[in-house]
Amino acid sequence: MSEADRAFAASWWLVDGLVRAGLEHACVSPGSRSTPVALALWRHPAVKVHVHLDERSSAFFALGIAKASGRPVAVVTTSGTAAAELLPAIVEAWMSRTTLVALTADRPPELRGVGANQTIDQPGIFGSFVHVSIDAPVPGDAPDEERWREL
């Protein structure tokens, strides 16, 4: 299985797990690192995808959908400072007890802290304004379906 196929498989299982937990909408700000997740969301029949070029606007749009629907909404960004653009909406969601699921792509761990393009210290970026923060592993040679669905 190619690296791209492994990334898509893991992303599909992640998205399917989120759908099983009530996800119906996702707001995507396209970027190369988040492509597997964006494609999985786009191809999932239960998810309505909203594309926004600006990450901050996308996050607030997602917050509006989540508040209106009472259901979790995903917001997807690529790596680096794109993830930081979500913080204002994440704080608003936290304060209003509204569920946003931030899916922020990142560089592989070996590219962190070495000056790689679009790389910041992403794990834990939202601090105390989230219930859970997971630094998902790079999908291995045989991604574990159940593990990715449970993330």
Task: Give the label of every model feature segment.
Residues 1-151:
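N-terminal alpha/beta PP-like core and its mobile active-site loop of ThDP/TPP-dependent enzymes
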